[in-house]
Amino acid sequence: MIKYTVLPEQKKVIAIVTDCEDDVIKTIAKNMPENLYFNEGAYKLKHSYKGIAKCHPDDEFDEDLGKKIARNRALIKYKFAYLRKIDLFSMGLLKWILDTGEKGDTCAQYIESLALELKDKTKTE
């Protein structure tokens, strides 16, 4: 939701994107398997993001233009934070996959070495 505050005497418009702290968590939960657990607190956004449009003193104040500019500035901040959290989650997931794969390879190598050891023991007996 975007809320606007118009201050014509200051030739200023403020736009605030609100109620967005759980947006990343909702995206992750919607797109991942139900049995995937993650630390939700690490992916929370701020409660709001603010954009401000200030009119030059020599220019004529235009409320609609000010709203568009302030809205875009607020959304840029919000989207940048959102994408940073998605990237953080993606990197964590990728690291987990790679770590799991490495552990799996290590486990497979260990089993293979035990099998070779057992094979060598049976040859000598």
Segments the model singles out, each with a brief description of its role:
Residues 1-124:
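Catalytic phosphate/metal-binding cores of nucleic-acid and nucleotide-processing enzymes, i.e., regions
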